[in-house]
Amino acid sequence: MGHKIHPSGLRLGITQEHRSKWFATSKTYPILLQEDFKIRTFIQKKYGAAGISDVLIARKADQLELELKTARPGVIVGRQGSGIEELRAGIQKTIGDNTRQVRINVVEVERVDADAFLLAEYISQQLEKRVAFRRTIRMALQRAQRAGVLGLKIQVGGRLNGAEIARTEWTREGRVPLHTLRAEIDYATREANTTYGVLGIKVWVFKGEVLPKEEKTIPVGASPKRKAGRRPQQFEDRSNENS
C-alpha cells in the first residue's frame, strides 16, 4: 500500500500538512479550489527560474496569504520589493479580483539539495540538455548525500537516451521506508521535454522519523519511576562532623 499511494497524501496530519488551509461551503468550495490551482500554475510559469519548491495558501475572510518556498528569493523579491508588488498584481489579475488583499511571504529553502522538488527540477534540466540519464542520477545522488539526507530514491521513465522502446529505471541510496507513517518523506514529480519525447521523473527523499512526544500522567501522591540504567546518587553522611 505504501508503495502505491501518494507519500504526502498518506501522511497528511501525521508528518505532512495541507498545502491549502481554508474552509468553505459546498457552493464556494469549487471556486476557491480553482483559484488555488490557477495561482500555483501562474507562479510556476512566471517564476520557474526562481526554484520554487512549494506554494502554501491560507485564507482568512477576504484575505489571501501565500508562502513561497524558494531556493532563490532574490529573484522573486526584486529590488526594494518591486517583485512582490508585481507578483501581487499578477495574482489579483489571475483570480479576477483586484480588490482582494494578498499577503506574500517568501521563505528561503535551507538545504536546496535535500528538497525533492528542486532535485527533480535539476534532473529535468540536465535531461533536457541531453546529459545521459545515468550520469544525471549519479550527480543528483551525490548532491543529496552531501546535503545529509538519510535516503533517496529516483525513478526516470520514458525513451531513455533516445531508445525506441520506453522503459523505467530507478535507483535508491540509503533507507526510504514508504510503509512507515512516522517517516518524513519528501516526494515530487517533474517532466523533462526532450527531442525524443517526455520523460517522467519521481524523487523520494527520506529526512528522518518524526516521533511524537510521549506525555505520561503520574497519579497524585505517586513518585515518578527512576530511569533504567541511571546510577543512583551517593550522599556522604556528615551528621557526626559537627558533634
From Swiss-Prot:
Instruction: Extract the GO molecular function terms from the UniProt entry.
Output: mRNA binding; rRNA binding; structural constituent of ribosome
**Listed SMART domains:** KH (SM00322)
Q: Which cysteine pairs are joined by S-S bonds?
A: none
Name the Gene Ontology biological process terms.
translation
Q: Which InterPro entries match?
A: KH_dom, KH_dom-like_a/b, KH_dom_type_2, KH_sf_prok-type, Ribosomal_S3_C_sf, Ribosomal_uS3_bac-typ, Ribosomal_uS3_C, Ribosomal_uS3_CS
The answer to whether the entry has keyword Glycosyltransferase is no
Q: Which domain of life is it from?
A: Bacteria
Gene Ontology cellular-component annotations: cytosolic small ribosomal subunit
Q: Which PROSITE patterns match?
A: KH_TYPE_2 (PS50823), RIBOSOMAL_S3 (PS00548)
Tell me the segments the record calls region Disordered: 216-243
* Ranges where the KH type-2 domain occurs: 39-110
Give the UniProt keywords, A-Z: Ribonucleoprotein, Ribosomal protein, RNA-binding, rRNA-binding
Basic and acidic residues bias (residue ranges) = 233-243
Describe the protein's quaternary organization and the partners it interacts with.
Answer: Part of the 30S ribosomal subunit. Forms a tight complex with proteins S10 and S14.
UniProt record similarity statement: Belongs to the universal ribosomal protein uS3 family.
Per the entry, what this protein does is:
Binds the lower part of the 30S subunit head. Binds mRNA in the 70S ribosome, positioning it for translation.
Protein name stated in the entry: Small ribosomal subunit protein uS3
Q: Lineage of the source organism?
A: Bacteria, Bacillati, Cyanobacteriota, Cyanophyceae, Synechococcales
